[in-house]
Structure formats: C-alpha cells, structure tokens
Amino acid sequence: MMDDSFKNYWMNKLKYFSLFILLFAIYWFPDVILGYPEIYLKSLVGYDRQATATWIFLGNMAISLFLGILICYKLGYYKNTLSIFKIKNILFLLFTTIVLFIIYFFTFTYYNSHFITPGIAKEQAAYSRQIVFPFVQFISFAICAPIFEEAAFRTTIYRFFKNDKIAFIVSSISFAWMHTGANPILIVYLPMSVVLTLIYHRRRVLGESILVHCLMNALLPTIIVFLQTITGLYYL
C-alpha cells in the first residue's frame, strides 16, 4: 500500500510537470512561422509574404487553441466557469481588474522613469509586426496568451503542489520571471502576477483569472494612455 501511494504521488507530479511543458509547446507552436520565415516564406516578398504568414499563423493558432482548450476541458480545468456570472463574482472581478490596471500603471510609470526598456524587446515586437499583420499579434496577446498562461501557471501549478501557500508563491514568481527573467521590469510583472494568482486562489476558478488577464492584455495600451491623460503622470 505504501509503495502504491508513493508511486501515485510521483506519477501525479510527473503528470502535471509534463502537462506544464505540453501547454507551452502547444502555445508556442504558431510562433514557428515567426522564428523561421526564411524557410517557410523564402519565395515571397512584401504584402504576399505578410498575408501568407498571417494565414499560416492564424491556422496554427486555431489548432493550438483547440488542442489547449480540449486538454484543459478534459482535465476539468474549466470547472465552475459559469459561476463567474454571478453578481458578486462579476463585481469582484471588476474591482480587481481596476486595481490591477492602477497597480500596473504606477509600476510601469516608475519603471519607465528609472530604466530603459531592453532593445531586444522592441526589436522583437517590430519584427513580429513585419512578419504578420498586427491584428494577429493582438489576438495572440489578448486571447491565446491568457488561456495558456493561466492554465499553466495557475491550475497546473496548484495541482502540482498540494500546499496552497507554496503553489501561490511559485505561481506568482514563476509567471513574472517567465516574462522578464533577471531584468528590472520584474517590478512591473510581479505585482500583476500576484493579483492574477490571488484571483485564481480565491475560488480556484480558472475562467476568472483568464478573463481578467484577457481584459488586461487587450485594454492595457488604451488604459495607460487614459490614466496618463487624467493624472498627468508620465514620470514617477
């Protein structure tokens, strides 16, 4: 009995560790077209090159979303999703979304006032826009990223660690670190990660953190400009 319990324990760990890797492999699948355009699009130039890359990217993205959502659904990741639409939960998510935008605004303003955004990040963004049409990048950023990242960094990590406190810490730090690495911009991503983890931690409903993450990614550029306009705060 002891041997079976020990085996099941480690098999469960292996299952969710492998799932974490699998989710990211599926998530990054569409980016193959961005990484190797000279292989897939070498005979095309200009608009034809960008249009073809866009359709390939959209097709790959559709496959990734289908596989990712199917896997998460089969594993019960979307349990209680419809409960999001209860009034008290909607109000909570609205409040935390507003708080998240405000926190991000102040941390981002502070970061921009004291540090320089790495050139590589700017180059990568510009390069992506040259390969595919901008709306595709928006879909990837506002829809795909939240679905896969929340599934990996929230539910998968919480199932890997049975201790909720450890899961909370690992989820918050690893999500932020994955986006920044050893870079000062961690001061922007870590508070955001903590809030997103708190949203999931509250009821263990993945749909809630996905929804807030989607709103964050979709509206962030507009909200930043709006808050700068009404506060007059550009440096901190």
UniProtKB/Swiss-Prot annotation:
GO terms for cellular component: plasma membrane. It is found in: Cell membrane. InterPro entries: Rce1/LyrA-like_dom. It holds the Pfam family Rce1-like. It is a multi-pass membrane protein. GO terms for biological process: CAAX-box protein maturation. Keywords: Cell membrane, Membrane, Transmembrane, Transmembrane helix. It comes from the Bacteria. The chain crosses the membrane at residues 16-36, 51-71, 90-110, 131-151, 180-200, 210-230. The keyword Transmembrane applies. GO terms for molecular function: endopeptidase activity. Belongs to the UPF0177 family. This is UPF0177 protein YaiH.
